[in-house]
């Protein structure tokens, strides 16, 4: 999934001699405002069947010793989320944390569960303060990952009417129930965004900034699905 942010940036006016504390000076006494873009993808997953679960994978450096004499080996540890509150998670650079939606009822040719892994493009954390309006109304941004059991009434991560609702609502409210999400019909909510400190090159019309994520098969296919593609032709493109 790819989203492109572009257009004319929001600007503010400065007094004579005033410093642009919250943005970048792009014209005389005009600054473009620092800001962030956020999106929440609602992924109603059906990986090889209706009953799914989410697994977290983290990489761990093995201490230098008999199994790691050169100090460069690492292994992975996995955790299966059982309830909604266990699945309220954030990215962690130190362990290259990833999440995979799996079907625990099926196996691939190596005996592992087939799945699809969320592969981020840009990881962003919100800069709003606790107690602010956006903190109350858009609390879903506090985590990169949420997982809920399927409910047709739970469609918008901030709730039905965020502009008229003082909050909290949506995902923070729904997940207070702490429902079971292991081997269930689940919905995965993934929050991603773009942190934009404006450049002069973004003015007056900014080029597209790409953001998003990928769903990459992880044990879903028994081998590389590219192996049986027809060979490329060397025909000339024109005559």
What are these regions (language model features)?
Residues 2-17, 21-239:
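Extended effector regions of multi-domain proteins
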